[in-house]
Each structure stands twice: as C-alpha cells, then as structure tokens.
C-alpha cells in the first residue's frame, strides 16, 4: 500500500482530519499531480478555512500551474488568517511568497 493509499484510508476513517487531508494534497504534489493537489487543498480550505498551512502550499501549487491570480488571492487570504491566529511564522512565509509574486 502506497503512502497516498494509507493516507486515503486514514481520511476515510476520519473525513474531518485536516492534517490527513493536507498530507494527501502534499502527496499529490510530490507526484506532480498539481490538479489533484489543488482540488484536495481547496476541499480542505472549505472544510477547515483556519488550517493555515494550507495557504502557502495551495498558493504554490497554483503557481506551478501558472495561475498567479489564484496564487495571490490564496496567499492574501492565508496571510489574513495567519495574522488572525497570531501565527507569525506562517504570516512571514506568506508575505514572502506574495513579495516574490510581485517581483515577477
């Protein structure tokens, strides 16, 4: 059983487990299946909008498919949520990603 299959089995047991859904998105991206990674992290964003790690990765995956408009929107939303939850490290990373987009 692959890591992705294991994670999917865990998610089937607990569909509200944000970390497992996040890890599935990362596994798809690791396989360069950015469409599935985006779909999975968008589902996570719908289910648990305050799961801050989602935003940096999701924005990056949008960049991988050359969708800078969505990447920027995701980074900005994540930055607001990170600041709201006082996650200064995530806020810093999201701001850096936004700045990098602006430099392009």
Regions found by a protein language model. Give the residues of each.
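Conserved structural position within tetratricopeptide repeats
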Residues: 9-12, 43-46, 80
């Amino acid at each position: 059983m692959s890591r992705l299959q294991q994670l999917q089995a865990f998610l089937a047991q607990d569909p509200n487990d944000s970390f497992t859904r996040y890890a599935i998105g990362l596994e798809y991206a690791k396989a360069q299946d950015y469409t599935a990674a985006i779909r999975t992290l968008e589902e996570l964003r719908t289910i648990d909008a305050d799961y801050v790690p989602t935003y940096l990765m999701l924005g990056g995956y949008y960049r991988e498919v050359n969708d800078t408009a969505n990447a920027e929107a995701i980074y900005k939303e994540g930055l607001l949520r990170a600041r709201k939850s006082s996650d200064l490290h995530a806020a810093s990373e999201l701001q850096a990603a936004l700045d990098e987009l602006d430099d392009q």
